[in-house]
């Protein structure tokens, strides 16, 4: 998986940036606020999430790991794909989104194009306990705040597992072994998911 990119910015468009790293130009989808920090011809570093589908591999870029983790958490909501997750992060910054979820502010969530009242209510129900309070760097309390969680979930999603499935397996592994490393947690989560098939 590609977790971050550093290199020269070749192009900045409305919804993506092209960054050259080791002679290869990578197209990275990003929010307008992230794109506003990038200038053509300068060096940049983005934290990324790589989403692998049957017919595509897409990179999504973020200014920090916290926002990337929030993006991956949004993908766990039924009916929320990468485009809708990016739209949500385009309308709300990480703290604003955390606050809206903590307060159950359906009106704030429906400002996102593509999210209606039902979708906003579902987001509140499914994410309220997974996302920490506004101002918190942890994406969720206890097990979900484990530093190993995000890379393991990202790797599982990259291998084709549903985000919700990946999160549940990872949380189960980390609840049983609080000292797990990224590689040991990934192996254990894959083992769990293999038994479930």
Curated annotation (Swiss-Prot):
Gene Ontology molecular function: any one: four-way junction DNA binding
Keywords of the record: Cytoplasm, DNA damage, DNA recombination, DNA repair, DNA-binding
GO biological process: DNA recombination; DNA repair
Keyword Repeat part of the UniProt annotation: no
Membrane-spanning ranges: none
GO cellular component terms given for this protein: cytoplasm; Holliday junction helicase complex; Holliday junction resolvase complex
Stored Gene3D superfamilies: 5' to 3' exonuclease, C-terminal subdomain, DNA helicase RuvA subunit, C-terminal domain, Nucleic acid-binding proteins
Region (Flexible linker): 139-143
Start and end residues of each stretch annotated as Domain II: 64-139
UniProt subcellular location: Cytoplasm
Region of interest (Domain I), residue spans: 1-63
Annotated spans, Domain III: 144-197
Subunit structure, as described in the record: Homotetramer. Forms an RuvA(8)-RuvB(12)-Holliday junction (HJ) complex. HJ DNA is sandwiched between 2 RuvA tetramers; dsDNA enters through RuvA and exits via RuvB. An RuvB hexamer assembles on each DNA strand where it exits the tetramer. Each RuvB hexamer is contacted by two RuvA subunits (via domain III) on 2 adjacent RuvB subunits; this complex drives branch migration. In the full resolvosome a probable DNA-RuvA(4)-RuvB(12)-RuvC(2) complex forms which resolves the HJ.
HAMAP family: DNA_HJ_migration_RuvA
UniProt note: domains: Has three domains with a flexible linker between the domains II and III and assumes an 'L' shape. Domain III is highly mobile and contacts RuvB.
Function: The RuvA-RuvB-RuvC complex processes Holliday junction (HJ) DNA during genetic recombination and DNA repair, while the RuvA-RuvB complex plays an important role in the rescue of blocked DNA replication forks via replication fork reversal (RFR). RuvA specifically binds to HJ cruciform DNA, conferring on it an open structure. The RuvB hexamer acts as an ATP-dependent pump, pulling dsDNA into and through the RuvAB complex. HJ branch migration allows RuvC to scan DNA until it finds its consensus sequence, where it cleaves and resolves the cruciform DNA.
Family statement drawn from the similarity comment of this UniProt entry: Belongs to the RuvA family.
Listed name of the protein: Holliday junction branch migration complex subunit RuvA
Organism listed in the record: Mycobacterium marinum (strain ATCC BAA-535 / M)
Name of the gene this protein is made from: ruvA
């Amino acid at each position: 998986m590609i977790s971050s990119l550093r290199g020269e910015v070749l192009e900045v468009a409305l919804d993506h940036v092209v960054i050259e790293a080791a002679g290869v130009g990578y197209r990275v989808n990003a929010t307008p606020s992230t794109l506003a920090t990038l200038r053509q011809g300068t060096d940049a570093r983005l934290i990324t999430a790589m989403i692998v589908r049957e017919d595509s591999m897409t990179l999504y870029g973020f200014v920090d790991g916290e926002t990337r983790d929030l993006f991956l958490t949004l993908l766990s909501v039924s009916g929320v794909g990468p485009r809708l997750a990016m739209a949500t992060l385009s309308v709300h910054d990480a703290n604003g989104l955390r606050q809206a979820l903590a307060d159950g502010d359906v009106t704030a969530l429906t400002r996102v194009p593509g999210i209606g009242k039902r979708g906003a209510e579902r987001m509140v129900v499914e994410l309220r306990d997974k996302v920490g309070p506004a101002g918190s760097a942890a994406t969720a309390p206890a097990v979900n705040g484990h530093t190993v969680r995000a890379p393991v979930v990202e790797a599982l999603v990259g291998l084709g597992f549903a985000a919700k499935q990946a999160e549940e397996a990872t949380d189960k592994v980390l609840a049983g072994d609080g000292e797990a490393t990224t590689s040991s947690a990934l192996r254990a989560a894959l083992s769990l998911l293999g038994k479930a098939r």
